[in-house]
């Protein structure tokens, strides 16, 4: 084993020495393999080897050291220690390699010369540093103690060296044999003997070696004797002979790497403890002394041998020397020949194999050594790294500890400071809350006083009287405000009042003063508007006063004479209320329930102003586009004296209309160019710049929900108009939230209701939360809200003011999803998740809202009809051909006969010569003669039949056929034979006779030719089965059974992709055209196959020809079954179209019952595409209908409404909820069906009131189709919630929560999509805080979704603004 890897950390010098010696030992392995083995054997029994004289100094030195360490021998000489040191410490010059090279160059040189050459390279420094090397050996011993873990590697290396040594024995034995023979021959010659040495066979050289060793011992003893004579010379010779003897032993046995390794291995095994090491050293000292004696004996023998050799050499003559030389050369050549021819290649291969094996093992050894070295290094690095990691961890934990300690102290300090601040803040909040409460109470009291003062003047309570809602659960209790009626004082600024120190009485007085000032300011503003002089220089103050008389106080008026209709009692009260508002300069909201005549009341107040105060305008009426014509017609009908300008149309038309009020020096009297201008919300915003120039006497906004948003440009534009009074007409002032009510109130009284935040703090939050979660509502707060609203708003309900108006019955019709709808619904549900919906709901971006709205619309489509996603289209083969065309059907007669005119696009041009020379009979072909031959040789020719009538054709008489008829049958094809055999019976033809009962059949003028013969037909009374309908069916049940068979209901398995007529054959010859036409379209066959023409049948009936004498017709065979016919066009099944939608199936049943009971129906839709599908259904069921949606023009809307009201044969009116739900009168209908409901329940209420309004005498039934267990059912719950808000605010009703509804929170749109499943509820009810946040997000998201749903639509005027 290479020990350098073991000594790398302790002694670099020693490591290098060991490595160098190891390399030399490996190189010397070629010549010393056999000698190593012998030396090792000699080392195991040292005494015997010395007795025989076979041991060398160097070989025994290493072997004896190994045996001494094992305890097998008694002692050794000093050369063992020298050899151990030499095997470890490197030599400056390596004599081993030089001796090997000299042996290879000349094997026959003198042995003594080889020893002398090796001795010259011995370094003298070695002897001088001997003691230092011993110390190095002791250090190495200490290192070897640490190398016990490398024993396995040492064993492997030892096995490798043994293998290399055994492989090199063959070559060493051969070389030793040759050298021994040569030396023996030379010795015999020198001693005067004739023998040339003992001849040996190939193989072992043990005997020769033994003899040579004996000679060497003798020579060494002789040399010792000669050395004693020399005195001092012998002493120096003994000193110098030590390396000489050492060199002499090298040719016989050279130390190999295996021996070194073996000795090192044995040394490592022995020196396991320090005590063992010390004992081994003592034994080595003992053996060292014995070694010196042997060294001296060997030097003596060699000296004697040298002297004897010199004497013998002097006696040899020149001739003998040549003979010896020649003999030596011949022997040397023969030896090398045998060596090169036989053993050279074999030894070379063995050397290569041994070298390769040695290199492989050395690589393995180096890898293992490197691994072990890295393992030690890795262990040290890991320990160092662990130490660093532990230090960092300790530092980090210490830092975290102090940081946590500081944080805890800081938090405690902040907590203490926060407690102090919270306490101070709480006290401040209590003071501020008390201050704000007093502020809020001051504002509400001021508003109440203002309303109280106005109410006393315009007497709203008296006008409402018993017409108000009896469900209102409170009465006015503000009589204590009367003491502030005549209070005087200066108004106080709201910000200058000290709410902390002022008492309640002083605050009430200040509020009363401010209310009086506000009331006077409103009245003064109205007077200023009336007294504003016109820009006409011809007028004066008196004329102005005549036109605008002084406003009166409390008035009581009757119906104006200008009004050409009779007002009902509650309408007269409404007129008085409006007149008092005008007199006080106060704006108002006429919020009567829909259908109570808000339009005629507003027209009556205009008539009152014109008749009583001579105020003829200008009046501005702004209304949805769908009611423009209605307003114009009613104003012209009720007040014919009013001149009405219908301000709509394109830009050019409106420019012409603006000339009526764009005049200077203009006075509004009875003779003015116009009095009332009627326009739409869209146009008033588009032309706002022109309307702002005018000072309008009275502005009426119909369907005031259109300005429900205070942020819209429409609201801001209308608010900027200069008007003396504003009147808002609405049946539903609150649709979704209290903010809409504030928008209307601020519009009529901007100074009083100037802050939406304050109004929200007053009322909105509590009322809306009460409607959503059924919380307790503050009755006092609700009472104060009604006190504020009462002076500005007049509302009556139908059942209290119109006893003759029929009831309204609302019915929710629940439908189930069909199989196809369920599949679509489940597919949509599986593609959404709770978390995604909540993320979208909390996200305020437009994209998330749009995605949510798209999901909602997809679910609603599934509920309506699955064909909204994918229609079952018409299927047809590709028609490859050309069809006939006509320029105009108007040019055709009433009886249009369509002949066969289809042509194939592919044409075959037949040469004319082919037709004329081949197909036509000429002198050049045999066509004519062939026809004649066929006719002559026809066995059915009449002449043949007549000649053979009694024999072969005797059967003709039994079939009632003549020879000529037989001849004709033989020439006919199968179709012609079927036509001739067709017979008619009376009962069969009655079914297909279209004019059977049209004309009288008494005319018997027709007489068939057969009657002219003197042959009477057999008459009997036997009944014919064919003439009886029922007997015929009973006689043969084949058709009845076939109708119920599966084959009759089977659809075609495949359809042709392409259909085309036959390829057309074209020839430039008129005769060919006629022949082709006769062949393909034989008139007789064609008339028999096709039905009888109408004109021809009419002529036959007029001539009273019996049915049995009719010409043959309608003989085309019937189709295989009811699904397969002669056409490849497949229309989708309408029955399947109806049954695939749960709503449509229910509607189909409902319409049948309604039609039987003479009802007329309004059907409202949200989707125009669903209206398209409904038109197909109504056409299939043959229900007469008309349609109105957002795309209908104004003129068309007027005509449609007129047709519905005047034509009772129209059964169904299809309307869009947004376009047909406002302003139009459809009282001719008594049934309303909502196919799908609107997000806003108020829109649906307005739509159903198109039928349930003034003038309706029958009960109105409202059906609402809802799909069970879907998004529509939950949308209906939210609609009821919104209706609850309206009832609380407008009618004073307190919501009574159902037990079931109280446990179910109203979900937002995300819950509308997912439903009330357990997983969604569990995900949102984990803690109360998250639940509250989700409720807030649901409110905001629901609002965003509703805005998106109606985005792009005109407010209450349809999905698309109509073209004007």
From Swiss-Prot:
Q: Where is the composition biased (Basic residues)?
A: 243-255
Instruction: List its EC numbers.
Output: 3.6.4.-
Q: What is the lineage of its organism?
A: Eukaryota, Fungi, Dikarya, Ascomycota, Saccharomycotina
Look up the domain of life of the source: Eukaryota
Composition bias (Basic and acidic residues) maps to 213-227, 1330-1353
GO terms for MF: ATP binding; ATP hydrolysis activity; ATP-dependent chromatin remodeler activity; DNA binding; histone binding
**What is the official name of this protein in its record?**
Chromatin-remodeling ATPase INO80
Quaternary structure? Answer: Component of the INO80 chromatin-remodeling complex.
Family to which the UniProt record says this protein belongs: Belongs to the SNF2/RAD54 helicase family.
Q: What does this protein do?
A: ATPase component of the INO80 complex which remodels chromatin by shifting nucleosomes and is involved in DNA repair.
Give the keywords, sorted: Activator, ATP-binding, Coiled coil, DNA damage, DNA repair, DNA-binding, Hydrolase, Nucleotide-binding, Nucleus, Transcription, Transcription regulation
Q: Which GO terms describe its cellular component?
A: chromosome, centromeric region; chromosome, telomeric region; Ino80 complex
Name of encoding gene: INO80
**What is the catalytic activity of this protein?**
ATP + H2O = ADP + phosphate + H(+)
């Amino acid at each position: 084993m290479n020990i350098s890897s073991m000594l790398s950390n302790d002694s670099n010098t020693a490591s290098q020495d060991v490595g160098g010696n190891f390399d030399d030992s490996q190189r010397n392995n070629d010549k010393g393999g056999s000698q190593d083995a012998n030396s090792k054997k000699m080392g195991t029994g040292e005494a015997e080897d010395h007795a025989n004289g076979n041991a060398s100094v160097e070989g025994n030195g290493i072997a004896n050291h190994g045996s001494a360490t094992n305890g097998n021998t008694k002692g050794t000489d000093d050369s063992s220690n020298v050899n151990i040191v030499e095997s470890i410490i490197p030599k400056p010059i390596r004599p081993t390699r030089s001796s090997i090279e000299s042996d290879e160059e000349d094997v026959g040189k003198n042995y003594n010369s080889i020893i002398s050459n090796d001795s010259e390279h011995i370094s003298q420094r070695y002897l001088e540093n001997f003691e230092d090397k011993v110390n190095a050996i002791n250090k190495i011993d200490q290192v070897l103690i640490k190398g016990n873990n490398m024993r396995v590697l040492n064993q492997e290396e030892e096995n490798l060296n043994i293998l290399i040594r055994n492989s090199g024995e063959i070559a060493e034995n051969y070389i030793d044999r040759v050298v021994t023979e040569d030396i023996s021959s030379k010795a015999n010659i020198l001693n005067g003997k004739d023998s040339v040495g003992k001849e040996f066979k190939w193989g072992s050289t043990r005997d020769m070696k033994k003899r040579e060793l004996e000679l060497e011992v003798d020579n060494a003893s002789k040399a010792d004797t000669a050395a004693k004579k020399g005195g001092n010379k012998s002493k120096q010779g003994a000193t110098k002979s030590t390396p000489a003897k050492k060199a002499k032993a090298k040719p016989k046995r050279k130390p190999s790497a295996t021996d070194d390794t073996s000795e090192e291995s044995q040394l490592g095994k022995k020196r396991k403890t320090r005590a063992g090491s010390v004992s081994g050293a003592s034994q080595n000292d003992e053996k060292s002394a014995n070694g010196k004696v042997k060294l001296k004996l060997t030097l003596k023998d060699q000296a004697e041998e040298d002297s004897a050799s010199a004497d013998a050499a002097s006696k040899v003559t020149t001739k003998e020397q040549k003979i010896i030389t020649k003999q030596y050369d011949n022997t040397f050549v023969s030896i090398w020949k045998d060596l090169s021819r036989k053993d050279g290649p074999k030894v070379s291969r063995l050397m290569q194999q041994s070298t390769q094996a040695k290199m492989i093992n050395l690589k393995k050894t180096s890898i293992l050594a490197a691994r072990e070295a890295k393992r030690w290094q890795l262990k040290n690095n890991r320990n160092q790294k662990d130490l660093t990691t532990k230090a960092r961890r300790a530092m980090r934990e210490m830092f975290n500890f102090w940081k946590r300690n500081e944080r805890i102290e800081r938090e405690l300090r902040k907590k203490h400071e926060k407690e102090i601040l919270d306490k101070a803040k709480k006290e401040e909040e209590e003071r501020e809350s008390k201050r704000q409460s007093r502020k809020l109470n001051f504002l509400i009291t001021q508003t109440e006083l203002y309303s109280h003062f106005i109410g006393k003047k315009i007497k709203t309570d008296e006008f409402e009287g018993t017409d108000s809602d009896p469900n209102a659960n409170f009465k006015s209790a503000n009589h204590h405000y009367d003491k502030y009626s005549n209070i005087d004082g200066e108004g106080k600024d709201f910000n200058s009042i000290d709410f902390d120190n002022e008492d309640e009485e002083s605050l009430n007085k200040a509020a009363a003063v401010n209310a009086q000032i506000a009331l006077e300011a409103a009245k003064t503003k109205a007077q200023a508007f009336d007294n504003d002089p016109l820009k006409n220089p011809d007028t004066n103050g008196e004329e102005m006063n005549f036109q605008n008389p002084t406003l009166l106080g409390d008035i009581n008026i009757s119906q104006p004479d200008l009004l050409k209709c009779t007002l009902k009692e509650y309408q007269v009260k409404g007129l008085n209320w409006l007149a008092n508002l005008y007199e006080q300069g106060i704006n108002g909201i006429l919020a009567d329930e829909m259908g109570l005549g808000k339009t005629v009341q507003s027209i009556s107040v205009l008539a009152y102003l014109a008749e009583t105060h001579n105020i003829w305008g200008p009046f501005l009426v702004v209304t949805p586009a769908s009611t423009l014509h209605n307003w114009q017609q009613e104003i012209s009908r009720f007040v014919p004296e009013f001149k009405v300008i219908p301000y709509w149309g394109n830009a050019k038309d409106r420019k012409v209309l603006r000339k009526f009020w764009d005049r200077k020096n203009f006075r509004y009297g009875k003779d003015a160019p116009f009095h009332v201008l009627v326009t739409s919300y869209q146009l008033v915003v588009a032309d706002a710049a022109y309307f702002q120039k005018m000072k309008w006497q009275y502005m009426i906004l119909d369907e005031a929900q259109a300005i429900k948003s205070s942020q819209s440009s429409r609201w801001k534009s209308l608010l900027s108009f200069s008007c003396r009074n504003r009147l808002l007409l609405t049946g539903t002032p609150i649709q979704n939230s209290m903010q809409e009510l504030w928008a209307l109130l601020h519009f009529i009284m901007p100074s009083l209701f100037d802050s939406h935040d304050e109004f929200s703090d007053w009322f909105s939050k509590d009322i809306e939360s009460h409607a959503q979660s059924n919380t307790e509502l503050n009755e006092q707060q609700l009472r104060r809200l009604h006190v504020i609203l009462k002076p500005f708003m007049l509302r009556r309900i139908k059942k209290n003011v119109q006893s003759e108006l029929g009831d309204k019955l609302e019915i929710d019709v629940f439908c189930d999803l069909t199989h196809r709808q369920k599949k679509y619904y489940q597919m949509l549900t599986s593609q959404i998740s709770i978390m995604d919906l909540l993320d979208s709901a909390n996200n305020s971006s437009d994209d998330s809202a749009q995605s949510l709205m798209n999901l909602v619309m997809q679910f609603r489509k599934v509920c309506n009809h699955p064909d909204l996603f994918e229609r079952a289209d018409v299927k047809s083969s590709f028609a490859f051909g050309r069809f006939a065309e006509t320029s105009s059907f108007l040019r055709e007669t009433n009886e249009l006969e369509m002949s066969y005119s289809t042509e194939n696009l592919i044409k075959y041009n037949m040469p004319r010569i082919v037709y004329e020379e081949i197909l036509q009979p000429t002198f050049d072909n045999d066509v004519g003669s062939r026809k004649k031959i066929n006719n002559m040789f026809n066995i059915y020719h009449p002449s043949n039949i007549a000649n053979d009538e009694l024999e072969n054709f005797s059967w003709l008489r039994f079939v009632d056929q003549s020879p000529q008829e037989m001849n004709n049958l033989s020439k006919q094809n199968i179709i012609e034979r079927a036509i001739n055999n067709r017979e008619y019976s009376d009962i069969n033809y009655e079914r297909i006779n279209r004019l059977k009962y049209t004309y009288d059949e008494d005319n018997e003028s027709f007489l068939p030719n057969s009657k002219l013969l003197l042959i009477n037909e057999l008459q009997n009374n036997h009944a014919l089965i064919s003439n009886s309908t029922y007997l015929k069916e009973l006689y043969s049940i084949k058709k009845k059974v076939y109708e119920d068979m599966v084959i009759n209901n089977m659809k075609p398995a495949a359809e042709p992709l392409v259909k085309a007529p036959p390829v057309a054959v074209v020839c430039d010859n008129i005769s060919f055209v006629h022949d082709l036409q006769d062949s393909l379209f034989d008139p007789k066959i064609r008339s028999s196959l096709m039905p009888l023409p109408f004109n021809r049948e009419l002529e036959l009936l007029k001539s009273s020809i019996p049915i049995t004498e009719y010409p043959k017709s309608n003989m085309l065979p019937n189709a295989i079954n009811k699904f397969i016919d002669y056409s490849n066009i497949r229309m989708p099944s309408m029955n399947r179209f109806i049954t695939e939608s749960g709503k449509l199936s229910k509607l189909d049943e409902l319409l049948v019952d309604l039609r039987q009971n003479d009802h007329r129906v309004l059907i409202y839709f949200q989707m125009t595409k669903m209206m398209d599908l409904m038109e197909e259904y109504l056409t299939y069921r043959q229900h007469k209908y008309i349609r109105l949606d957002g795309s209908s023009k104004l003129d068309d809307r007027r005509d449609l409404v007129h047709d519905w009201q005047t034509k009772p044969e129209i059964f169904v009116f299809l309307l869009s909820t947004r376009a047909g739900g406002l302003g139009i009168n459809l009282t001719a209908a008594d049934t309303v069906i909502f196919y799908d409901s609107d997000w806003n329940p108020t829109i649906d209420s307005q739509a159903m009131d198109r039928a349930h309004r003034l003038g309706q005498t029958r009960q109105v039934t409202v059906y609402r189709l809802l799909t069970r267990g879907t998004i529509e059912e939950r949308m209906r719950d939210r609609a009821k919630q919104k209706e609850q808000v309206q009832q609380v605010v407008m009618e004073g009703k307190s919501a009574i929560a159902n037990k079931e509804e109280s446990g179910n929170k109203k979900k937002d749109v995300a819950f509308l999509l997912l439903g009330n499943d357990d997983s969604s509820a569990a995900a949102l009810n984990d803690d109360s805080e998250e639940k509250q946040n989700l409720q807030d997000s649901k409110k905001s998201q629901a609002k965003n979704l509703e805005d998106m749903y109606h985005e792009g639509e005109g407010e209450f005027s349809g999905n698309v603004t109509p073209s004007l």
